[in-house]
């Protein structure tokens, strides 16, 4: 219970977490997420699954600093041959522990890629999850598998958005081969993941999806946004490979449009706003009282916690691997903020008395949470006001040209989608594997 609470607090502080899809049902389950974010991925699953989860984790994590945390999560060690000094014969113990947990109706989580990574793609799956499921099924346990997609917007950035999508649970066919079940898991996982090269396409996918959603007034549900991003990512990859001249021309058009937006201080979503004075007055009537209360809170929190915030950011720069950067920030931030609160509380207690020290220790965590809310709330309100003023100040012809340019770019996306559908329909039906690969895009 405590481990689950800590996980929820940690991930909801660092990320803006969205959860979508099918709630994991009760009974014996094996959850199968992708693994882009080191130790934060188990915390995300624990925070969003809606039920207690036990994890299968590499045995080396049970040693040293992370040992108590891993044990608190009720993790089951797996002994990997690539880890030095590990006796892989002990995996018999792992299978026995997994079978016992599933027989008791528990939920197990294993990351079937076997590694944490920053490729932006689903890596080839190991067969361990399939072997666990088939082993439990052979012993009479009605186990179901749940594919999960972890989709970060900017995974190393504090307060960026993280979307966790749970797929439909499906039963294990006890007659299936290990390889067939592994392939089915991979296919189901791909439908929940936005696969985009973080160096080439990831930011572009987000940008294009924002533009398209604004122009088409597209459904704003989490599932719809992820589906759009999957199509856009696949379309960009295919276009760059098969029609590079079209890809470059479209990218140039998008960059020109973005430069014009920046020149006028505008965003896609504001081009259709109503700029009437009545709307402005209603906005001010709502936001000014909030600002009177929240701006001092935000300023106080910033002044008090600027030191641990800076130390956390500095420590994260020491990590070159982006798949562990967010984990380093969370762990480093927890340590730096806790020590800072302790130092200030001891200082207050020494100079103002024990009661003042205890009150300081109780008040500062509340100030940190309230300050985070206030900073985000007022930053959003300020951004809205600035965008409204920029739109109001732009000439009507400018707004019209920008909307037309946005519409043209959305039309290009529709043309790309139609092109991919046409190419897919012309693939030879005999080559089923290649056809399935194309359909996944």
Region annotations inferred by a language model:
Residues 285-310, 325-376:
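Alpha-helical bilayer-embedded segments of polytopic membrane proteins, i.e.
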């Amino acid at each position: 219970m405590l481990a689950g609470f800590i996980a929820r607090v940690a991930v909801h502080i660092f990320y803006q977490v969205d959860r979508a899809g099918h709630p994991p049902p009760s009974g014996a389950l094996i959850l199968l997420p992708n693994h882009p974010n080191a130790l934060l991925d188990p915390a995300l699953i624990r925070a969003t699954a809606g039920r207690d989860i036990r994890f299968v984790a590499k045995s080396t994590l049970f040693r040293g600093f992370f040992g108590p945390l891993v044990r608190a999560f009720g993790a089951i060690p797996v002994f990997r041959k690539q880890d030095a000094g590990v006796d892989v014969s002990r995996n018999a113990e792992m299978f026995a522990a997994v079978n016992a947990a599933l027989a008791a109706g528990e939920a197990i989580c294993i990351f079937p890629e076997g590694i944490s990574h920053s490729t932006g793609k689903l890596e080839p799956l190991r067969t361990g999850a399939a072997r666990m499921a088939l082993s439990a099924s052979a012993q009479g346990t009605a186990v179901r598998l749940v594919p999960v997609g972890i989709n970060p917007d900017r995974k190393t950035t504090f307060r960026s958005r993280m979307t966790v999508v749970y797929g439909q649970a499906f039963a294990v066919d006890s007659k299936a081969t290990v390889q067939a079940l592994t392939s089915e898991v991979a296919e189901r996982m791909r439908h929940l993941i936005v696969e985009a090269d973080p160096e080439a396409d990831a930011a572009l996918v987000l940008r294009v999806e924002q533009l398209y959603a604004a122009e088409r007034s597209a459904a704003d549900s989490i599932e719809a946004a992820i589906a759009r991003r999957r199509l856009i990512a696949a379309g960009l990859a295919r276009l760059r490979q098969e029609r590079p001249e079209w890809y470059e021309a479209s990218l140039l058009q998008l960059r020109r449009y973005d430069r014009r937006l920046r020149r006028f201080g505008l965003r896609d979503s504001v081009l259709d706003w109503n700029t009437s004075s009545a709307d402005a007055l209603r906005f001010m009537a709502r936001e000014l009282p909030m600002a009177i209360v929240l701006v001092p809170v935000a300023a106080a929190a910033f002044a008090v916690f600027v030191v641990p915030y800076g130390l956390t950011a500095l420590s994260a720069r020491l990590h070159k691997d982006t798949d562990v950067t967010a984990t380093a920030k969370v762990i480093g931030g927890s340590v730096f903020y806790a020590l800072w609160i302790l130092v200030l509380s001891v200082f207050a207690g020494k100079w103002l008395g024990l009661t003042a020290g205890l009150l300081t220790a109780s008040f500062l965590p509340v100030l940190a949470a309230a300050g985070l809310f206030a900073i985000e709330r007022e930053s959003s309100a300020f951004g809205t006001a600035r965008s409204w003023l920029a739109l109001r100040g732009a000439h009507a012809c400018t707004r019209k040209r920008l909307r037309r340019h946005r519409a043209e770019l959305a039309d290009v996306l529709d043309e790309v989608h139609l092109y991919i559908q046409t190419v897919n329909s012309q693939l030879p039906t005999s080559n089923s594997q290649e056809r399935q690969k194309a359909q996944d895009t």
